[in-house]
């Protein structure tokens, strides 16, 4: 099932296997490493906005890589492009939230996966999703809200579709 060894031995490729369903069978690689690195540096020096920009840049790269893993862009999905664009923004914002607010041992892609699963649960508040409730705790100028833009301002059903898109891409 894991052809990484064959690709390395015979073709010289260095392959990393990331299996979110079975993390113990994955290679030891934290996809959020660069995001966490620059977030930690930014927390030490809040005046250096270039560190914050690098954090956001790497979060966006990870989200784009996961959502558009087939190499296509959102425009090639036709009527579904809204959901894929929104899913990318939502995933970027969740990565930033995990990196900023979780403890060191919890800042990895599995925590992102788990948070997305938790956000799919009903909120109990009519007209509000779990994601909207989560982002209400953040200041108005927090970048996670900016990245979530389109997904944050949709109805409950559309938001569930966006979350399902993210979850399907993380699987």
Q: Language model features by range: what are they?
A:
Residues 1-171:
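P-loop NTPase motor domains
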């Amino acid at each position: 099932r894991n052809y990484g060894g064959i690709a390395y031995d015979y073709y010289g490729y260095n392959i990393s296997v990331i299996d979110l369903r079975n993390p113990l069978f994955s290679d030891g690689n934290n996809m959020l490493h660069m995001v966490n690195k620059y977030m930690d540096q930014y927390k030490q020096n809040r005046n250096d906005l270039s560190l914050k920009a690098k954090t956001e840049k790497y979060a966006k790269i990870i989200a784009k890589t996961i959502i558009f893993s087939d190499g296509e862009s959102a425009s090639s999905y036709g009527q579904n492009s809204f959901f894929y664009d929104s899913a990318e923004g939502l995933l970027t914002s969740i990565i930033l939230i995990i990196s900023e607010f979780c403890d060191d041992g919890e800042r990895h892609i599995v925590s992102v996966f788990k948070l997305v699963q938790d956000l799919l649960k009903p909120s109990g508040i009519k007209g509000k999703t779990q994601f909207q409730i989560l982002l209400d705790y953040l200041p108005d100028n927090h970048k996670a809200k900016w990245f979530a833009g389109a997904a944050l301002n949709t109805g409950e059903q559309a938001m569930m579709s966006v979350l399902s898109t993210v979850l399907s891409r993380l699987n």
